[in-house]
Amino acid sequence: MREEILELTRNTKETQISMKLKIYGSGVAKISTGIGFFDHMLEAFTKHSLLDLEISCKGDTHVDFHHSVEDVGIVLGQLLNEALYPLSGVERFGEASVVMDEAAVFCALDLSNRAYLVYENFNENAKVGEFDTELVEEFFRAVAINSAITLHLNQIRGKNTHHIIEATFKSFAVALRRALAKNARIGTPSTKGVL
């Protein structure tokens, strides 16, 4: 595992992204994607995961927010992958149930070096402000695939779409923080001997 600050830049015809990540940080966020609601969710994720995360994204938001949201997920996933593997000396598995008022979301994840996403959230509304709620799943799919983690996100209940999405980001944050908890007794957390 790599504990230093990692950096990655990704430039396409649709987005220009620069990102810095420190997996054992203190929850410091410096986020600018040009999408206010998405920035708010990434700041909540950073705070509760205790990662340090700096993101600058300039995207074709005049088209829609899809490219920016998905590409931020891709870059975050790639940095997590670089930081995590080969995995050693951490819990590996993490889970969290997070509530926000009437909304409750459960997250379970495995730092398995095996990419998989189960996403069962049923957002009440198609938009929060100008943000298309279907992009939340696209973001988490990009993170899971590019980080090679197995990620399950399940809405237990909820009516307010903002609350549901925020509980989703926070449950992922807390589960990731727990999976990254150091445990020197574990060594490589797999009977295969490598992850």
Swiss-Prot record:
Keywords: Amino-acid biosynthesis, Cytoplasm, Histidine biosynthesis, Lyase
Pathway where it operates: Amino-acid biosynthesis; L-histidine biosynthesis; L-histidine from 5-phospho-alpha-D-ribose 1-diphosphate: step 6/9
EC category name: lyase
Signal peptide: none
GO molecular function, one term: imidazoleglycerol-phosphate dehydratase activity
Entry-linked SUPFAM superfamilies: Ribosomal protein S5 domain 2-like (SSF54211)
Entries under InterPro entries matching the protein: IGPD_sf, ImidazoleglycerolP_deHydtase, ImidazoleglycerP_deHydtase_CS, Ribosomal_Su5_D2-typ_SF
Keyword Membrane tagged: no
Biological-process GO terms, alphabetical: L-histidine biosynthetic process
Cellular component per GO, a single term: cytoplasm
PROSITE patterns xrefs: IGP_DEHYDRATASE_1, IGP_DEHYDRATASE_2
Keyword Amino-acid biosynthesis: yes
Main location: cytoplasm
UniProt EC number: 4.2.1.19
Subcellular location: Cytoplasm
Catalysed reactions, semicolon-separated: D-erythro-1-(imidazol-4-yl)glycerol 3-phosphate = 3-(imidazol-4-yl)-2-oxopropyl phosphate + H2O
Superkingdom of origin organism: Bacteria
Family: Belongs to the imidazoleglycerol-phosphate dehydratase family.
PANTHER family recorded: IMIDAZOLEGLYCEROL-PHOSPHATE DEHYDRATASE, IMIDAZOLEGLYCEROL-PHOSPHATE DEHYDRATASE HIS7
Protein's name according to its UniProt entry: Imidazoleglycerol-phosphate dehydratase
Native source organism of the sequence: Campylobacter concisus (strain 13826)
Gene designation: hisB
